[in-house]
Amino acid sequence: MDARHAATVRLETIVSLAKRRGFVYPGSEIYGGLANTWDFGPLGAELKRNLKNAWWEYFIQRREDMVGLDGGILLHPRVWEASGHVEEFNDPLIDCRRCKSRFRADTLIEERLHRSTEGLSLDEMTRLVQEANLACPVCGVRDWTPVRKFNLMFRTFIGPVETESTPVYLRPETAQAIFVNFKNVVQTSRVKIPFGIGQIGKAFRNEITPGNFIFRLLEFEQMEIEYFIRPEMWEEYFDHWLNEMGQFLRWIGFKPDRLRTREHGPQELSHYSRKTVDFEYFFPFGWKELCGLAYRTDYDLRRHQEYSGEDLTYFDQERNERYIPHVIEPTMGVERLFLALLCDAYDEEPAVDVNGNPYTRVVLRFHPRVAPYKVAVLPLLRKPELVTVAREVAQELRQYFRIEYDETQSIGRRYRRQDEIGTPYCVTIDYQTLEDRTVTIRDRDTMQQVRVPISGLVEEIEARLRSA
């Protein structure tokens, strides 16, 4: 069985591991759950934090041409009119008249008829469903409403009275907070084109999701950059950011053979984009978008200048020229990267326990940069003399690394648990430790163990993490 075929059969395994080990829980589970919502448990919270920290370090902290922003979730309603989301941010939906189930028409057609819906109008999709005599996947009846547009933004209201004159929206993307603050950043940060503004934050989309775990969510986190450039330089910087995104994905541990790029066709492009390229990952359910790069031209700043009446041009001192900058946008979703990392890191291999019994060893081979815990500290046995030293070692390591201390069950079971949650190194305190103040460091991927003095343990782990 090749790697790609193996990947197609194990989404259930990934979901089971994520729940069992505390990466992801169904949302509101004690109340029966809420469709398409998920909570991230102790390990999931650590993995998300490491992923966001890695993104911030790579794209913001390491570059002199980047600054950060933390924009609000609620923005003035006119922002979304100017951005085009009120008119353009729609999915084509179709309903079964019998059971009232609702589906994305494009997904239904592509999955059932195996043909692209790129460029099709709503009427053309309606006609395709009728001519193919498609049955409802839920009840089997062939009685459909016409395909219609459905706006994906969540609406809410400010104030005690809900009226149509006071709606606001939960932001469907983080980008607009950057555009409406462009003038503020230029005036307060001494930035010069080319420069970028990056932020990490929640976004919300009222989508009909396909049920592929956390691949597509109603509530999710985006890591976005708006990079402002001279109009004539867009191709150079588009290529630059495409390369940077690929380098980042490899930097956090993705296998290159499970990544590819795909450029959007003309009919696929978002209303603001002149060119978009996706990085796709080979998920258990096939090649799907992992993250994307878009050339947004001057669409957003020009529209906000028009709708707000504010001057959003930039004065380029080097050229003695005023213009509206163009924008290159690298964007990544935290949860989608999270799922891809779980899939990419998951591995099974035959092994033999200390008693000679064969078993299947499950390992999450996370890069140490994103692994939830860097080190586990394990006393060989739950004996007071070993536990005392182990807790002292754990307390020392906590000052430098995110660690886990565990003294429950046999040492073999504890090793297997740490393998399954992706911990790169296990430090074991045994009876030799009491004699010579040395401990063993076990490598997750090779299972090799070496003895190291406690006095040099921090330096040894730091060296291993740096060289990973």
From Swiss-Prot:
Chain positions recorded as ATP binding sites: 205-207, 215-220, 289-290, 333-336
Record localization: Cytoplasm
GO MF annotations in UniProt: ATP binding; glycine-tRNA ligase activity; protein dimerization activity
The EC number(s) this enzyme carries: 6.1.1.14
Record InterPro entries: aa-tRNA-synt_IIb (IPR002314), aa-tRNA-synth_II (IPR006195), aa-tRNA-synth_II/BPL/LPL (IPR045864), Anticodon-bd (IPR004154), Anticodon-bd_dom_sf (IPR036621), Gly-tRNA_synthase/POLG2 (IPR027031), Gly_tRNA_ligase_bac (IPR022961), GlyRS-like_core (IPR033731)
Uppermost EC category: ligase
Tree of life domain: Bacteria
Record GO biological process: glycyl-tRNA aminoacylation
Keywords carried by this UniProt record: Aminoacyl-tRNA synthetase, ATP-binding, Cytoplasm, Ligase, Nucleotide-binding, Protein biosynthesis
Binding site for substrate: 104, 173, 220-224, 329-333
Statement: the UniProt record of this protein carries the keyword Chaperone: no
Reactions this protein catalyses: tRNA(Gly) + glycine + ATP = glycyl-tRNA(Gly) + AMP + diphosphate
Cellular component aspect of the GO annotation: cytoplasm
The keyword Chaperone is assigned to this record: no
NCBIfam families registered for this protein in UniProt: glyS_dimeric (TIGR00389), PRK04173.1 (NF003211)
Job description of the protein: Catalyzes the attachment of glycine to tRNA(Gly).
Family of this protein: Belongs to the class-II aminoacyl-tRNA synthetase family.
Subunit organization: Homodimer.
Protein name: Glycine--tRNA ligase
Organism of derivation: Thermomicrobium roseum (strain ATCC 27502 / DSM 5159 / P-2)
